[in-house]
């Protein structure tokens, strides 16, 4: 065993800071994540740089703000020349692995929604130290490694490694029960017609009215969270007899919408057990323009509520989304428990730093809104962060 510590880095997608047992959620139980906090340090005011996915993930990897690394919003891949902390760890002798979601490149066919602002000719070039931000590599790319066309029907070309400093990748793209990447190929090996289990058109019956609530037909043991658990445990098995330290990022696509907790996790939590946030009721106060617009869209039946953008909800819809989100987080917590147990089986728990965080949050009823958008509300930019050092 190496005298250098290992790092096991758990990250979820679209996970508010207050949706953990250890952060005081009144209903949700997360005993395994809580156990990390109990032996480490939980940061109560941990804020991300942006209220959506790609800018924050690029900031996490580079330590630089979106205005510097260039991923200003979703649809802009992080430069393959960007120097990441995993590149530094790899160069220093750590084995590096990504199991799950990356989202450092585009995983939809949609590009940037806004052009990059023109460079002011009066600005000076970057000063000393800028060379640390980029890698001295020839060429640039490839940038199609998370493209859905690359992974269609379980057929894919090998990934170009290292991938932003990761020398081992088990990739998941997308969300809910329609996750792609290596997961799609794995699922095809389980079922002759796995596509018949995925998506709203194949869901099981239910009476929920919340937009994007899908009772998936995929069994728990074949849901993306279970795949990530399996691959993370396989990676720990591979590292057990290794003298090199490792850094493993275990990245869950949940609890990002659509709301698709499988099996027992679907109704593990009840809408009637949830409590609307105080900001759901605005009373007689006038709404700011963006909130008023969202309410008007809902009341007119004109709201687009099937995509990625913020939309308004009524009380019942918010409570259902909150309950389903708790179910998705509960499954992630169970997977984390299994992975931590695997770490202990191999005797690596005494030499492994364990971290838990997320890329951004979700309104989940704040101000009668759902999902995320270009607004720096606490529900979107405040995320969990737990660091448990080696004993």
Located regions from the model:
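Formylglycine-dependent sulfatase
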Residues: 1-391
